[in-house]
Design a protein with these regions (language model features):
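Bacterial N-terminal signal peptides that target proteins for export
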Residues: 1-7
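Post-cleavage N-terminal segment of exported redox proteins
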Residues: 4, 17-20
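Alpha-helical structural motif
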Residues: 6, 318, 361-365
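Bacterial N-terminal signal peptides
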Residues: 7-16
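C-terminal functional module detector
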Residues: 21-35, 48, 128-231, 328-333, ...
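Non-transmembrane alpha-helical segments in soluble domains
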Residues: 244-248, 323-326, 366, 370
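Glycoside hydrolase catalytic-domain groove-lining segments
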Residues: 312-335
Length: 521
């Protein structure tokens, strides 16, 4: 068995304010490092019922699954799964999207917020006409929650081999075309009947439902046109501030009396901003809206530290954005997620007290998220000789065993850190990095170290925040090449995350070449 990844990365946050009172926000202040338990969790993970056991077998103990279409929490966890895994913890969670005034995708971990709709009909896509009736829809009501009556039809097609120009004729009954931003109809009234669509046409159309059923007919020549996607979907279709309020403080219930808005526990959970792509100014607007907006994704398996191409990913936009936000003096926690990739990398490790029944520990898990008592983890991916991921996948016991702010005369003096749990046979070397608003401020080769907080001429703390990164790595790499501490120190986190000896087949490894390591070390 070989390892695809060679480094384990932990990132955690301490934010300091260098004002006269030297106020320091330390998320780990109340952690009892002698008794703490490490609970692997995720804040953004899509999964079906059938994948729950796989996630549990990977070492996850806290499973707040977050699906969409519809954006509906999978909580409580299915009874058969809970019986087979009596110690497993859950929480309501869902990914929200399609606001009317922002491109944001966000998760509301610990929230019952339920939105959306999604159906992909099982139809023969090689036979014309395709006809389907979507049922159980909300009729658009401009005076009462109008967003519930807005739906998006996704219709994609391409030309069959050597067939020339592809086209379809589309008819929609029970709905009129409308803008999802303000629900206005086009000048023709939004009626869609025998409308010809070509490859140049929009692949998605938004409709307002005029009946609880929408009937769709697609007429095409199968010899010329191949249907590749046909589905009816729904997002939030509300301003982002309204969706945040509903997720955090809403009180709505469904027809059976079950909550579909608001937090399960007022003191736990909150909002995470997924794969952030907006400016620091816009992110600051989200974070300033409510202290329960917790932070941003720093690692998403689809894009690593940001970017869907190798060139873009190398600039680490999520990672650099995190530091840019922290430089403003705002609290912003960083999250590490797999998103849709079950067999990828990225975990949030919650720091929780021992003991307690399931209900108590579910509350404590959400409190850990709210208060920032967690760290991000990128474990080395276990792969077989064929390069395919295998058990235990990215599970790792590498962890922080101490993150303590030392004070003298009630003033913060240093940050003391220690780590443990690495596979010392495969990765005997450890490096700890301390990062401030000025960049990498201190590097320690070893499993413990201290960072003396810098002081300005007037005696005040001279940094706005401190982050800590810890890595475990081997002596050699890529078929026996020496990996010295000096060579390792020269690498940034993006380069470290891509180090491997064997090419894997999941997630971002498509960015690599056909063989071996992507870096010449």
């Amino acid at each position: 068995m070989t390892k695809q990844g060679i480094a384990t990365l932990g990132v955690l946050l301490l934010v300091g304010a260098s004002h006269a009172a030297e106020r320091v926000l330390n998320p780990y202040r109340d952690v009892d490092w002698g008794t703490v338990t490490y609970v692997h969790s995720f804040s953004h993970q899509h999964a079906t019922h059938g994948r729950l056991q796989t996630l549990r077998d990977m070492g996850y103990e806290h499973l707040p699954i977050s699906n969409y279409y519809p954006s509906k929490p999978l909580y409580p966890l299915p009874e058969d799964f809970r019986k087979a895994n009596p110690d497993v913890l859950g929480a309501p969670n869902a990914e929200q999207h399609s606001t009317t005034d922002s491109p944001i995708h966000f998760n509301a971990i610990g929230s019952y917020y339920t939105t959306g709709y999604g159906e992909t009909p099982r139809v023969r896509r090689d036979r014309s006409p395709i006809e389907h009736v979507f049922r159980g829809l909300h009729v658009f009501d401009p005076a009462r929650e109008p967003w519930r009556g807005i739906y998006r039809l996704d219709l994609r097609f391409d030309a069959a081999a050597n067939s020339g120009e592809a086209s379809v004729r589309l008819t929609v009954e029970g709905a009129r075309q409308a803008s999802y931003k303000d629900f206005s109809e086009p000048a023709d009234g939004g009626i869609v009947r025998d409308r010809v669509l070509t490859l140049a046409s929009a692949r998605s159309m938004t409709f307002k439902a005029t009946a609880p059923e929408i009937r769709v007919q697609i007429v095409f020549d199968p010899a010329v046109t191949r249907i590749t996607q046909f589905r009816l979907m729904q997002g939030t279709y509300r301003p982002w501030r309204d969706t945040f309020r509903a997720a955090l403080d809403g009180s709505a219930r469904d027809a059976e009396g079950r909550p579909i808005e608001g937090l399960m526990f007022p003191e736990g959970g909150g909002i995470t901003i997924n794969h952030p792509g907006e400016s620091v100014t816009r992110l600051a607007e989200y974070l300033d809206f409510d202290p329960r907006v917790l932070g941003i994704e720093v690692w998403n398996q689809h894009e690593m530290f940001g970017g869907q191409t190798l060139e873009k990913a190398a600039t680490m936009p999520f990672y650099t954005l995190w530091d840019e936000v922290l430089r403003t003096g705002r609290r912003c926690f960083g999250f590490f997620v797999k998103d849709h990739c079950i067999f990828g990398r990225g975990r949030n490790v919650l720091l929780m007290p021992p003991g307690g029944d399931t209900a108590t520990r579910e509350r404590q898990a959400l409190q850990a998220y709210r208060n920032g008592r967690f760290f991000g983890l990128l474990g080395a991916m276990t792969v077989g000789a064929d390069g395919k991921p295998t058990m235990p996948y990215d599970q790792s016991n590498f962890r922080f065993t101490r993150l303590a702010l030392r004070r003298e005369a009630d003033k913060p003096v240093s940050l003391d850190v220690s780590v443990d749990g690495a596979d010392t046979q495969r990765r005997p070397n450890t490096q700890i990095r301390f990062i401030t608003d000025q960049g990498v401020a201190c590097v320690v080769d070893g499993n413990s170290g201290s960072f003396i907080l810098p002081r300005s001429a007037d005696g005040r703390v001279a940094c706005r925040y401190v982050r800590v990164e810890a890595f475990a790595y081997p002596n050699t790499h890529s078929g026996g090449q020496t990996l010295t501490p000096a060579a390792f120190t020269a690498l940034n986190v993006f380069q470290i995350a891509r180090l491997h000896d064997v090419r894997g087949d999941s997630g971002v490894v498509y960015m690599d070449g056909k063989d071996g390591t992507p870096l010449g070390i």
